[in-house]
């Protein structure tokens, strides 16, 4: 079995961004891949180059006869605090998406000895036969329960994708500033438990940047459990000036519930799933919250039908909830606002790098999908940097930007030498990862 990539990677599409210069899309005939040598660094091996290409495709000499090999597609997995996305490399978007929250039976159920399941994942959480305690193996993007993560991967491979993991290479995303032991634990799980033939671990922010087709940029990621502002130069993240904010989409959901309860609704923590749906369908980010408050409440009123058929109405809480991103004190956080943290990271860069990053601010993460989010961030950054020209760029499906970047990367012929094979892991140990995953 060979682990080479034989499928055509899908180019990322730059959509409705505020920066017009990234709005054009090249035709398939003008999209070619730059596969530089290993010494050029990961970015130059992964970037899509949009230019005319007149050189003929390299052909294999007819004199060289190779044995016919079984070829399989690599699997890309992006495990986040809120959701896990997975699918085969080369596809434009993930084919499977499940909640990272799992269910564990309460102790009295687990002790009955009736051989019932110990962990419920994904669709198994719908109408379970036993009472479940919901838990999440990640805290602010960092894995704290590896046994539960293994249960999630077991479900992904065998129930969702229905594949044999020992037949597919796996590319895994890793959050910024994560412990180095994360990578070693992933290698141990994939190689020793699932017997995968090869694996690679890549930084989430770098993968997000690849989905935009860039080699440098300031990645602003607002996910479910944590937010990051990551400067990247020629494919290399700069951890010393990376900003981390411990508030994100889950905090927005909780704050929305508080606002609705203050307005007379009665939601509990057990109904956060409903509040999450309300957030996605009804909420937005105001360009100017002060002016928005002056608008009559009736103009903001919108109806939402609960699962039991009861109708509720939302007014100003629709946009007030998202103000926590720009004023974290609303949720009793002492950290900087997202826009302030972004400018802080830019100011820590030297002048030349700052100029490059200022024009390449790349949004990603599910929470940035709120209507009005890119425009508001653009306005705040322009206000704080009047002498510069910050440009916020967005993709239409930036909630899956990490996975899409991984799909592109794992498909590239120039990337194939960077797989870590199980035989290499068995011979050299987990530290061999750092030779290929950097």
From Swiss-Prot:
Provenance organism: Bos taurus
UniProt cross-references to InterPro entries, sorted A to Z: Actin, ACTL7A_N, ATPase_NBD
The protein, known as: Actin-like protein 7A
Family classification: Belongs to the actin family.
PANTHER family: ACTIN (PTHR11937)
Cellular localization per UniProt: Cytoplasm, Cytoskeleton; Golgi apparatus; Cytoplasm; Nucleus
One Pfam family hit: ACTL7A_N
GO cellular component, one term: male germ cell nucleus
SMART domains: ACTIN (SM00268)
Major subcellular location class: cytoplasm
Job description of the protein: Essential for normal spermatogenesis and male fertility. Required for normal sperm head morphology, acroplaxome formation, acrosome attachment, and acrosome granule stability. May anchor and stabilize acrosomal adherence to the acroplaxome at least in part by facilitating the presence of F-actin in the subacrosomal space. May play an important role in formation and fusion of Golgi-derived vesicles during acrosome biogenesis.
Description of how the protein assembles with itself and partners: Interacts (via N-terminus) with TES (via LIM domain 2). Heterodimer with TES; the heterodimer interacts with ENAH to form a heterotrimer. Interacts with ACTL9. Interacts with CYLC1; the interaction may be relevant for proper acrosome attachment to the nuclear envelope.
GN (gene name): ACTL7A
Residues covered by region (Required for interaction with TES): 36-56
UniProt key word Cytoplasm: yes
Biological process annotations from GO: acrosome assembly; fertilization; single fertilization; spermatid development
Keywords on record: Cytoplasm, Cytoskeleton, Differentiation, Fertilization, Golgi apparatus, Nucleus, Spermatogenesis
